[in-house]
From Swiss-Prot:
This is Cytochrome b. GO terms for molecular function: metal ion binding; ubiquinol-cytochrome-c reductase activity. The gene is MT-CYB. Belongs to the cytochrome b family. Heme b b562 binds at H75, H174. It comes from the Eukaryota. One of its GO terms (cellular component) is mitochondrial inner membrane. A ubiquinone binds at H193. The cytochrome bc1 complex contains 3 respiratory subunits (MT-CYB, CYC1 and UQCRFS1), 2 core proteins (UQCRC1 and UQCRC2) and probably 6 low-molecular weight proteins. Binds 2 heme b groups non-covalently. SUPFAM superfamilies: a domain/subunit of cytochrome bc1 complex (Ubiquinol-cytochrome c reductase), Transmembrane di-heme cytochromes. It comes from Naja multifasciata (Burrowing cobra).
Amino acid sequence: MSNQHTLLVSNLLPVGSNISTWWNFGSMLLTCLALQTMTGFFLAIHYTANINLAFSSVIHITRDVPYGWIMQNIHAISASLFFICIYIHIARGLYYGLYLNKEVWLSGTTLLITLMATAFFGYVLPWGQMSFWAATVITNLLTAIPYLGATLTTWLWGGFSINDPTLTRFFALHFILPFAIISLSSIHIILLHNEGSNNPLGTNSDIDKIPFHPYHSYKDMLMITSMITLLFIILSFSPNLLNDPENFSKANPLVTPQHIKPEWYFLFAYGILRSIPNKLGGTLALLTSVAILTTVPFTHTSYTRSMMFRPLSQALFWTLIATFITITWTASKPVEPPFVTISQTTSIIYFSFFITIPLLGWAENKMMMMNN
C-alpha cells in the first residue's frame, strides 16, 4: 500500500540503472513547458490582439512593463530550446527503438503536431513583417485542398485576407493550445510509466532497477540547470540571436520581404515544402514530413530493438540527422541554385530513411542468422 502513496513515488519509482543522459530531455521539455506557460500568461496580460496595436503592445512590454523584456525574451528563447529538446528527444526514440511502445510514441507524435501548431500561431502574434508574410504563405496552403480549399482559407482568415479577425483567433488558439499540450503531456507520461522506460541496450530493465530518486533525479536537475544557464546566457548577451531581423518592422501587406521563411525550427518542413514545385504536392510533403513518424512502430523489422548493435542502421540514422540539418540550412536560403537542388536531394534522402530502415532491419536479421 505504501508503495502506491504519491509522496513516495519519487523515492520508489523503479528505473533501469543504465539509462543515459539522452533520457533527461523529457524533464527538460517539462521545464520548458512550465517556463512557456508562466511567461506566456504574463505576456498575455499586456498583449493586445489588434493589427493596429499588436506590434506597439510588444514594444510596450519590452520597454515599459517592469521586467517585460525578460519575460518576452525568455518566452522567445525557451521556444527555441523547447524545439531543440524535442528534436533530440525524437532522435533518441528513433535510435533506441523506443517507438515500439506504440501508445507512448503515437501520443508523442500528436504532442509534436500540437506543439508545432501552437508555435506557428505564436509566431504571428507580434505582427512583425516576417510574422505576417509567413502566416500568409502557410495559411494559403489550405487553398491546395480540392473543392474545400478556398472556403477553408476564408474561414480561417475570417475574411478575404489576413486581418484583424485572423490575429484575434490566432491569439485565442495560442492561448488555449498550451493547455491541450499539458493534458497530452500528462497522458504521454502516464502511458510511459504504465510500461516503464526502456534503456540503451533495448533489453528488459526489470532485472536491474534502482530508485528514481536520488540516482536519476539529480541527473535530471543537472541537465535542467545546464539548459536554464544556456537560456540566461543567450538572454543576457544575445537575446535576439534566434529572431528574424524582418520582425523588427511592423507588418506591411504592401511590401513583400525578399525571402519569406518561418522560424528556424520549422525550416526542415518548410524546406521539404519548397523543394516540390507543385502546391498540392508540396503541402502533402509538408504534412507527411511530420506524420511519417507515426509509421515507424509498424515498420520495425529488426530482431534487435536498439540501434546500439546495428552499425548499418546507425550509419543510416546519422545520415538522417545530417539530412535534417542540411534541409534546415537550405530552407533559410533564397530559392535559387544550388539551394533548390540541395533541398530536393535532401528531401528525397529524408523520406528514403523511413523506407530503407525496415529493409535494412530485414537484411540485418538475415546476416545474424547466417552468423549463427
